[in-house]
Amino acid sequence: MLGQIVGGLIGGHHDSKKVKGTVVMMKKNALDFTDLAGSLTDKIFEALGQKVSFQLISSVQSDPANGLQGKHSNPAYLENFLFTLTPLAAGETAFGVTFDWNEEFGVPGAFIIKNTHINEFFLKSLTLEDVPNHGKVHFVCNSWVYPSFRYKSDRIFFANQPYLPSETPELLRKYRENELLTLRGDGTGKREAWDRIYDYDVYNDLGNPDQGKENVRTTLGGSADYPYPRRGRTGRPPTRTDPKSESRIPLILSLDIYVPRDERFGHLKMSDFLTYALKSIVQFILPELHALFDGTPNEFDSFEDVLRLYEGGIRLPQGPLFKALTDAIPLEMIRELLRTDGEGILRFPTPLVIKDSKTAWRTDEEFAREMLAGVNPIIISRLQEFPPKSKLDPEAYGNQNSTITAEHIEDKLDGLTVDEAMNNNKLFILNHHDVLIPYLRRINTTTTKTYASRTLLFLQDNGSLKPLAIELSLPHPDGDQFGVTSKVYTPSDQGVESSIWQLAKAYVAVNDSGVHQLISHWLNTHAVIEPFVIATNRQLSVLHPIHKLLYPHFRDTMNINAMARQILINAGGVLESTVFPSKFAMEMSAVVYKDWVFPDQALPADLVKRGVAVEDSSSPHGVRLLIEDYPYAVDGLEIWSAIKSWVTDYCSFYYGSDEEILKDNELQAWWKELREVGHGDKKNEPWWPEMETPQELIDSCTTIIWIASALHAAVNFGQYPYAGYLPNRPTVSRRFMPEPGTPEYEELKKNPDKAFLKTITAQLQTLLGVSLIEILSRHTTDEIYLGQRESPEWTKDKEPLAAFDKFGKKLTDIEKQIIQRNGDNILINRSGPVNAPYTLLFPTSEGGLTGKGIPNSVSI
């Protein structure tokens, strides 16, 4: 009798069975190489009895000694760890593990792992091959496990069966709650590499006041003047000279900036990323060395001078034999250096915009087309009042309304009056005026000399846009309250007026380039999505269905944003060095964030808000485009609808009523924290969804996924194809429009190309900017695209798996439709004069510089 009681208490081992499992893990590595010294040390620890143990946790059998939580199995250990050869190249290794199991224990719902080695390892998965009466049980882990002494609580992983909080097996609830508490931390202390804590902070680490006044930057976030989304907290100490500014780590340690360990790039991505950087540095340095022996070392003397950046280089052999050899190389960095896609090394790849023609980029048709199918197709709007009016406060900025008149444009409206053209939805505007004017006076005190622009366009019968007029404005010399001084330019193809028109378009491109980088790209994708990453990990358990839905769309975002704060958007960083707002760049983006509205990030809402579409319930996506051949919008609506259909199927499986949404305490805490902390500077905005209905959840999750995947792809991966040739999208202008009677005007008449190149981005800035966007435009080899998952076992629920499979098939159909549209000669905006088919919303891609592919997340 006593034996039965004891046997029951210890798990009934008299009828125990063996359950085999497979552990997939990757040892600590340095880029492509396994840390052999660390691996040897771990083997020594293993030989001394310091092992890696696993204990299953029952979801049905309680343990009185453990507060009636799920009972733990006896520890099981990795098998043959000592005798498994350590590969030189970093990669996954599978180990067996055998557990004692009995009928009373039932199905395991989680397991605890204890690493008593000295080094961390990456735990990919544990699969129990055949739990009696339950079959296979999968635990998808994808987490770095440090030595146990680094943690204050046990490392726990849950099986792939999702549960809403109220449906969680009683014996697993405490484990679920405690894991979330661990991930939240207590908001104190400096974060270390092994910490798994997600927390918030303001952008108070962009400047470095300890290095002088010129390196001071405004804190973004936490104020009405400069609101901003929150970033991940690092807990670094304050600077010596300003206790409100966070100190910075040395540039050489940039890769070590804190993000939770599981948010860091994987070894394949890090290898690709550093290889791309190495190649770009070489491509950057060689022209600079040549320039030392040039009479004008910081100037391109001609367009031929610019083109030499791309032509030549060392061409590696191509063909199946060489490809087979490189594919067999285990080291990703070397494989990437020896790419067989035809790219030369030691020269920049030829950007798509000049591949077919070296001059088509200069046409008015291409200038306008890129507003619909270029790298920044999300700004153009329909003109709804003429002349265009400013929304800036007239008390502070005077009269900012446009000086464009009907006389400037009516001869180009195919016989229509301005009112008739507007009423027929024929007039459109690219408007950068109000965003730039408040900062333009200060910007022009730097080496930048530029304008705020308005560009009017006419929708022609063939579906293309025709530029009508460009207005360039400067703050009034007597003060902001006196408004602006403006000049209007109209198209010309004759003499010096033609050269002036080309310069006017260049100033517009400079405006658009800066707005693209700071707002369309950085603010509207990178910055706004980070609070969602943090809140999801803090408030939604990995068991939560919505965590499982959103998790793939947050991959690598915190890491790339942290690196951006360290080397790109910081004081004196690459962004300040290459875009026209210079040191005012990030502050400008905070002012623009004042107008950010979460529901308006949904593609249909955005199109309607910009007036380029109208609501129409009879249209396939609920809106009708007023520019029918609008490649970004056409492809985007297909992608948007596919995402929404997938999210609807998924969420409807778990939530059938408003009550189920309201009683989900994790979901409500998640949304509350997003509003009040993550985007806390906008917490009182009336437009926030209340998260009270399944439809609000569906709409919100669709928008989050859209921002992280398709919107980012549309504004990121076209950077090199369109802006890799800087004359097409200059980032800086260095002098104003030449005035008659000046030496600059005479130069413009005699040598318009040289005058153009002396006006836009200088040679050094060009090389730096092109090097950066080449890196940012590449896909890494481990990229996971929309409609794909890292593991096929991401959930146990069959209906969501079937819905996800349907989503993938829909995306494949969309790819076929994009190919078909790109081959339709009637749709002239799909390729344009430069013959560059629109593929930025083509869902999949191979690695490298492809100009297509929608990664799941903001990952670069």
From Swiss-Prot:
<feature type="domain" description="Lipoxygenase">
    <location>
        <begin position="162"/>
        <end position="860"/>
    </location>
</feature>
<feature type="binding site">
    <location>
        <position position="521"/>
    </location>
    <ligand>
        <name>Fe cation</name>
    </ligand>
</feature>
<keyword id="KW-0276">Fatty acid metabolism</keyword>
<keyword id="KW-0275">Fatty acid biosynthesis</keyword>
<comment type="subunit">
    <text>Monomer.</text>
</comment>
<feature type="domain" description="PLAT">
    <location>
        <begin position="29"/>
        <end position="159"/>
    </location>
</feature>
<dbReference type="InterPro" id="IPR027433">
    <property type="entry name" value="Lipoxygenase_dom_3"/>
</dbReference>
<keyword id="KW-0479">Metal-binding</keyword>
<dbReference type="InterPro" id="IPR001246">
    <property type="entry name" value="LipOase_plant"/>
</dbReference>
<keyword id="KW-0408">Iron</keyword>
<protein>
    <recommendedName>
        <fullName>Probable linoleate 9S-lipoxygenase 4</fullName>
        <ecNumber>1.13.11.58</ecNumber>
    </recommendedName>
</protein>
<keyword id="KW-0560">Oxidoreductase</keyword>
<dbReference type="InterPro" id="IPR000907">
    <property type="entry name" value="LipOase"/>
</dbReference>
<dbReference type="InterPro" id="IPR042057">
    <property type="entry name" value="Lipoxy_PLAT/LH2"/>
</dbReference>
<dbReference type="GO" id="GO:0016702">
    <property type="term" value="F:oxidoreductase activity, acting on single donors with incorporation of molecular oxygen, incorporation of two atoms of oxygen"/>
</dbReference>
<feature type="region of interest" description="Disordered">
    <location>
        <begin position="209"/>
        <end position="246"/>
    </location>
</feature>
<dbReference type="InterPro" id="IPR020833">
    <property type="entry name" value="LipOase_Fe_BS"/>
</dbReference>
<keyword id="KW-0963">Cytoplasm</keyword>
<feature type="binding site">
    <location>
        <position position="526"/>
    </location>
    <ligand>
        <name>Fe cation</name>
    </ligand>
</feature>
<dbReference type="GO" id="GO:0006633">
    <property type="term" value="P:fatty acid biosynthetic process"/>
</dbReference>
<feature type="binding site">
    <location>
        <position position="860"/>
    </location>
    <ligand>
        <name>Fe cation</name>
    </ligand>
</feature>
<dbReference type="Pfam" id="PF00305">
    <property type="entry name" value="Lipoxygenase"/>
</dbReference>
<dbReference type="GO" id="GO:1990136">
    <property type="term" value="F:linoleate 9S-lipoxygenase activity"/>
</dbReference>
<comment type="similarity">
    <text>Belongs to the lipoxygenase family.</text>
</comment>
<dbReference type="GO" id="GO:0034440">
    <property type="term" value="P:lipid oxidation"/>
</dbReference>
<keyword id="KW-0444">Lipid biosynthesis</keyword>
<keyword id="KW-0443">Lipid metabolism</keyword>
<dbReference type="Pfam" id="PF01477">
    <property type="entry name" value="PLAT"/>
</dbReference>
<dbReference type="GO" id="GO:0046872">
    <property type="term" value="F:metal ion binding"/>
</dbReference>
<keyword id="KW-0223">Dioxygenase</keyword>
<dbReference type="InterPro" id="IPR036226">
    <property type="entry name" value="LipOase_C_sf"/>
</dbReference>
<dbReference type="InterPro" id="IPR020834">
    <property type="entry name" value="LipOase_CS"/>
</dbReference>
<comment type="pathway">
    <text>Lipid metabolism; oxylipin biosynthesis.</text>
</comment>
<dbReference type="InterPro" id="IPR036392">
    <property type="entry name" value="PLAT/LH2_dom_sf"/>
</dbReference>
<dbReference type="InterPro" id="IPR001024">
    <property type="entry name" value="PLAT/LH2_dom"/>
</dbReference>
<dbReference type="GO" id="GO:0031408">
    <property type="term" value="P:oxylipin biosynthetic process"/>
</dbReference>
<feature type="binding site">
    <location>
        <position position="712"/>
    </location>
    <ligand>
        <name>Fe cation</name>
    </ligand>
</feature>
<comment type="function">
    <text>Plant lipoxygenases may be involved in a number of diverse aspects of plant physiology including growth and development, pest resistance, and senescence or responses to wounding. Catalyzes the hydroperoxidation of lipids containing a cis,cis-1,4-pentadiene structure.</text>
</comment>
<feature type="binding site">
    <location>
        <position position="716"/>
    </location>
    <ligand>
        <name>Fe cation</name>
    </ligand>
</feature>
<dbReference type="InterPro" id="IPR013819">
    <property type="entry name" value="LipOase_C"/>
</dbReference>
<dbReference type="GO" id="GO:0005737">
    <property type="term" value="C:cytoplasm"/>
</dbReference>
<keyword id="KW-0925">Oxylipin biosynthesis</keyword>
